């Protein structure tokens, strides 16, 4: 699982989900990529699930890059707890994703297999996304 090693503050405010991505909008490492089309919080478990889906489909001969990192904690209070008494404890680590951000990149010689692998990964993510190539832009 992807989690930060050390954080300055254990609990944070929720980041705003508005605007479009200013950086990381083009495929820079691989040949194909998954580009987000809407705002979302993507958890470390969802990132890991998508990575496993890609790796199982391509088997060997390809390389995968993960361009997002879950660096924000989301908190939750226990069930059946009265209101008040402070903020809940951190439960998940999430990455704040904006439209246009390239989440995963893949380098693989066969285009059809690469697109199938990325499609499987998109189904594991909680957002609408599309497959882009190195030549395409947002």
UniProtKB/Swiss-Prot annotation:
The name this protein carries in UniProt is Large ribosomal subunit protein uL16
Which CDD domains does UniProt cross-reference here? Ribosomal_L16_L10e (cd01433)
Residues annotated as coiled-coil are none
Which PANTHER family has this protein been placed in? 50S/60S RIBOSOMAL PROTEIN L16, LARGE RIBOSOMAL SUBUNIT PROTEIN UL16M
Q: What does this protein do?
A: Binds 23S rRNA and is also seen to make contacts with the A and possibly P site tRNAs.
| Keyword field contains DNA damage | no
Gene encoding it? rplP
Q: Name one GO molecular function term.
A: tRNA binding
Q: Positions of the region Disordered?
A: 1-24
């Amino acid at each position: 699982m992807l989690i930060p090693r050390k954080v300055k503050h254990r609990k944070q405010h929720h980041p705003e989900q508005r605007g479009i991505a200013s950086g990381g909008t083009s495929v820079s490492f691989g040949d194909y990529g998954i580009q987000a089309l809407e705002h979302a919080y993507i958890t470390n478990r969802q990132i890991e699930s998508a990575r496993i889906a890609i790796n199982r489909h391509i088997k060997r001969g390809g390389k995968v890059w993960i361009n997002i990192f879950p660096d924000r904690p989301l908190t939750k209070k226990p069930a059946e707890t009265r209101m008040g008494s402070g903020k809940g404890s951190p439960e998940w680590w999430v990455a704040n994703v904006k439209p246009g951000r390239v989440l995963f990149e893949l380098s693989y010689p066969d285009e059809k297999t690469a697109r199938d692998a990325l499609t499987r990964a998109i189904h594991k993510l909680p957002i609408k996304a599309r497959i882009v190539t190195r030549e395409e832009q947002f």
